[in-house]
C-alpha cells in the first residue's frame, strides 16, 4: 500500500511541475490577411526604423549565454489614421538577413498593435540581432512605435527588458 501511495505521489509531483505553456499558438500573426495595395492610398510619407533585439544575452562570461523570447511590437499611435508597414526584415548579429516577415505591405488600424515573436529556442539572431521596418503614413499622422520585449523565465528566476526603435530615414 505504501508503495502505491509513493508511486501516485511521485506521479502527481511530476505532472504538477510541467510548464503551463500554450505551445499550440502561432508565434507570428498571419500578415497575409492584412495585405493592402499602397497604390490606392494617396500621398504617403515613408520612413525606416531600426529596432535592436536580443535572442541571446551573455551571463557571467562570454562563454555563458541565456536564450530569450523576443516580441517585436509594432504599434499605430494614431487615434484616427491607418499606418502601413511595407518591410519587416530580421537580421542577425553579423548584419545578414535571416527572415523577411512581409510579402506585401500591410495595414495597422488606429491604436492597433501587431507582433512578431521569435521563439526562445530560435537562436539565429544571436546577441546582436535587429529588425529594419519600412513604413508609410499620412503626412499629419504620428509615426508608428516599434518596441522590442525580451523575456526569459527559468525556474523561479525571470529576466525581461525592452528596447525602442529609432528612425533612421
Predicted features along the sequence, with ranges:
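Short, solvent-exposed loop/turn segments enriched in Ser/Thr/Gly
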Residues: 65-71
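Post-signal peptide N-terminal segment of mature Sec-exported envelope proteins
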Residues: 25-47
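Sec-dependent signal peptide recognition
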Residues: 2-8
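C-terminal motif of bacterial Sec signal peptides marking the signal peptidase cleavage site
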Residues: 13-16
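Asparagine-centered strand-capping/turn motif at beta-strand->loop junctions
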Residues: 74-81
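Short, hydrophobic/aromatic beta-strand segments
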Residues: 81-88, 100, 143-147
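Terminal connector regions
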Residues: 22-30, 122-169
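Intrinsically disordered, low-complexity Pro/Gly/Ser/Thr-rich segments with frequent PxxP/GP/PP motifs
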Residues: 93-130
Amino acid at each position: 500500500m505504501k508503495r502505491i501511495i509513493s508511486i501516485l505521489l511521485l506521479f502527481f509531483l511530476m505532472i504538477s511541475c510541467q510548464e503551463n505553456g500554450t505551445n499550440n499558438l502561432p508565434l507570428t500573426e498571419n500578415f497575409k490577411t492584412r495585405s493592402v495595395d499602397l497604390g490606392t492610398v494617396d500621398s504617403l510619407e515613408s520612413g525606416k526604423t531600426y529596432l535592436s533585439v536580443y535572442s541571446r544575452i551573455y551571463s557571467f562570461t562570454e562563454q555563458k549565454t541565456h536564450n530569450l523570447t523576443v516580441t517585436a511590437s509594432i504599434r499605430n499611435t494614431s487615434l484616427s489614421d491607418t499606418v502601413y508597414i511595407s518591410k519587416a526584415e530580421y537580421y542577425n548579429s553579423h548584419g545578414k538577413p535571416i527572415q523577411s516577415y512581409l510579402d506585401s505591405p500591410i495595414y495597422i488600424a488606429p491604436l492597433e498593435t501587431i507582433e512578431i515573436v521569435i521563439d526562445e529556442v530560435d537562436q539565429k539572431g544571436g546577441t546582436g540581432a535587429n529588425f529594419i521596418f519600412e513604413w508609410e503614413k499620412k503626412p499629419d499622422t504620428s509615426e508608428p512605435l516599434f518596441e522590442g520585449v525580451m523575456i526569459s523565465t527559468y525556474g523561479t528566476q525571470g529576466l525581461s527588458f525592452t528596447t525602442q526603435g529609432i528612425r533612421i530615414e
